[in-house]
């Protein structure tokens, strides 16, 4: 009885920590301008196999730990406020990438601007010119534009999830995964800063990493 009780306490404290971390990281993204209004969403896998996600219409800067959405991997709304409609594409990634434990989706300025450009390499939107994107996420494929909530977005991400750790949704913004929420957040920030460099460099000639450079990092 005592062991069962202690296990329950440990599980609860683990979920409470996860909720607190989501609130903290959401506020950090908002305060530093990575997220505005009610744009973007976060999710993570809990120890019990369910998903914790930001609710529909929520501002990342004003999340309430007790009102975060809890959803099953089959998409059933378990508790908390109603989940974002975009949680469906989060679920598509989790179901197809066993290494993914957390997802950050933002409408951050520079990555969203990049997602609106024509002529991007759909296999890798960010040609490597610093080592850090290669080390953190590797290639970043472009997913075709669909209206937010369209089931086809999840279908496309499901096909890519086992091979990539980050995705650029055309005319929409980035989706980045991680082994935990902090890692996903760090990966997102690295990508956003790299996209910022792309616009700062503009038409200047960039010294891209060679195939050998990339091989040493992979």
Curated annotation (Swiss-Prot):
Cofactor(s) named in the record: Zn(2+)
EC number: 4.1.1.104
Cofactor binding, per record: Binds 1 zinc ion per subunit.
Gene Ontology terms: cellular component: cytosol
GO biological process, one term: pentose catabolic process
Keyword Cell cycle: no
Active site: 86 (proton acceptor), 132 (proton donor)
Keyword set, alphabetical order: Carbohydrate metabolism, Lyase, Metal-binding, Zinc
Positions annotated to bind Zn(2+): 86, 105, 107, 172
A GO term for molecular function: aldehyde-lyase activity
Gene3D superfamilies: Class II aldolase/adducin N-terminal domain
InterPro entries the record matches: Aldolase_class_II_sugar_metab, Aldolase_II/adducin_N, Aldolase_II/adducin_N_sf, OtnC
The reaction(s) this protein catalyses: 3-dehydro-4-O-phospho-D-erythronate + H(+) = dihydroxyacetone phosphate + CO2; 3-dehydro-4-O-phospho-L-erythronate + H(+) = dihydroxyacetone phosphate + CO2
SMART domains noted in UniProt: Aldolase_II
Function: Catalyzes the decarboxylation of 3-oxo-tetronate 4-phosphate to dihydroxyacetone phosphate (DHAP) and CO(2).
Family (UniProt): Belongs to the aldolase class II family. AraD/FucA subfamily.
Name of the protein described by the UniProt record: 3-oxo-tetronate 4-phosphate decarboxylase
Source species: Pectobacterium atrosepticum (strain SCRI 1043 / ATCC BAA-672) (Erwinia carotovora subsp. atroseptica)
Species lineage: Bacteria, Pseudomonadati, Pseudomonadota, Gammaproteobacteria, Enterobacterales
